[in-house]
Amino acid sequence: MPENRSLALAAASSQQTRPVPQPVCQAVSVPCVTSLEAFHRAVADFAITDLDLMIEPEALAAARRSLDSSSLLLLGEMHGVRENPLLIRTLMQAFGLTSLALEWPEDLAPVIQAFLSGQPLADHPWLWGGDGRITAGHLAVLAECAAAGPLELVLFNGVIGADWSWSQRDEAMASRILAASVPGTRTLAVAGNAHTSTSHTELGVPMGARLASRRPGLQEIRITYGGGSFWNFEPRQFASRIGPEAMMRLYLHDGALALDLPVATEAVVPQRPQPMRESP
């Protein structure tokens, strides 16, 4: 399996810290876990299933054009949804992809590589952020992909300067994806949907726009969550936008790629209390 390319993280700050309350994990659905043992169990228990995703012919052609012209296809998600890794799996299979870029801390690369080579998942502080970008389902799907054949995995979230703007952070993420690109390899790049727009937004210049300026023809698939729940530091609900009886489909809407997920469910997310930094 190819080795990840990752940049070294800067040394941690020596500022004093104080404890914060433990995250509350619901007793019934247990959407977050606070121990490595519990996370191991959640990964092992995750049921990998084939999604019944209908890909309309025009959308299929548009996504393939993006991959053919730019070697990239973006997927904009809301973190903390159980179905997200299954959608990643479905899209990679549909387009024959073996390269995946995730908005995960790049310092996790050795931990994830070791896990994908068959070793137990090692503990690491960056696993426990709790925003939902890392879930039990992701680890289960990655393990399946790695077992099936070569998997090129890029983790592109890294250290930022204290004075960096939102746009500068996104520019750095785009640069990491491009630096890790292997000629001839086509990659699905997944991030929170604030970062995947290929044009400027009210937040600034997102990662997707930076990539599109360097890779003409790049397209974004944006997931629309029709309702249901997700985990982002705590249980949250989507506003109802699509009826639960609607079809899961990838289609073109006003020239843009859209993916409807009628009902979302909470992912199992690793989360531990993060120390709050005090001013020096």
Regions found by a protein language model. Name each.
Residues 2-280:
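Compositional signal for N-terminal targeting/processing segments
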